[in-house]
A protein has these predicted regions:
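ATP/adenylate-binding site constellation spanning eukaryotic-like Ser/Thr protein kinases
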Residues: 73, 141, 164, 172
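Proline-centric
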Residues: 108, 151-152, 178-181
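A short helix-turn-beta junction within AAA+ P-loop NTPase domains corresponding to the substrate/partner-engaging
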Residues: 169-185
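A short beta-strand-to-loop transition that corresponds to the Sensor-1 phosphate-sensing loop
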Residues: 120-122, 159-164, 181-184
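Conserved Walker B catalytic segment
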Residues: 122-156, 163
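Long amphipathic alpha-helical scaffold regions
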Residues: 174, 178, 189-196
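P-loop/Walker A NTP-binding region and its immediately flanking N-terminal helices
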Residues: 1-133, 156-158, 169, 190-195
Length: 197
């Protein structure tokens, strides 16, 4: 099932924002809800559409789209407690200040791609989970504020969490927040509606 079938409102919003003008897209996005996998899918799809060099279709096979589907695009980075750690970073339970510094250093140089940083939690088995005060601590979040507040063109930050309150208020205030229901919640809602009518 396509994202547009599962999440018509969100898909339409982001498709319209991206087709109108890339500048219409918020440069800091926060997805929240119970389904971290759906949030991650949305985040990678936004990254794919921002970097597609062809027709932006669901099955596009341009190099950028293939890289993003393979999670190997050089400008689309998942930032978690286990992903994209600098060599000298031995923290295993948090997104670290060293990762924040790595992002800042990466943004100093120009890129031919639209850079997307997806912040989430991921365990050793690859399971995606949302950010929370334990894995995305205030010190790290605060160290990112300047680059989120004054982002360069061609850079998007996406934060995934279960509850909005689990992310520092200063990140929330600089982000556009979207609730991503789990597909089970959507199915349940449709069943309730069909039961009434």
């Amino acid at each position: 099932m396509l994202l547009s079938d599962k999440y018509p409102f969100l898909t339409e919003y982001f498709t319209r924002a991206l087709s109108t003008n890339v500048r219409a897209l918020p440069q800091s996005i926060l997805f929240y809800g119970n389904d971290a996998d759906a949030q991650f899918t949305f985040a990678t799809e936004i990254a794919r559409l921002l970097n597609c060099t062809s027709d932006k279709s669901d099955n596009c096979e341009c190099l950028n789209c293939r890289w993003i589907r393979e999670n190997s695009h050089p400008a689309v980075l998942t930032i978690s407690r286990i992903d994209n750690k600098p060599d000298d970073d031995d923290s295993k339970t948090v997104i670290s200040i060293k990762q924040s510094q790595m992002i800042k250093e990466a943004l100093v140089s120009a890129s031919e791609f639209h850079r997307v940083f997806i912040f989430c939690d991921r365990d050793e088995n690859g399971n995606i989970a949302g950010l929370n005060p334990l894995n995305f601590q205030a010190e790290t979040a605060n160290s990112l504020l300047k680059i989120i507040e004054e982002p360069q063109p061609g850079v998007t930050f996406i934060f995934l969490t279960r509850y909005v309150e689990d992310v520092l208020p200063t990140i929330i205030s600089r982000s556009q927040c979207f609730f991503v229901p789990s597909f089970k919640e959507i199915s349940y809602s449709y069943n309730c509606i069909s039961d009434v009518f």
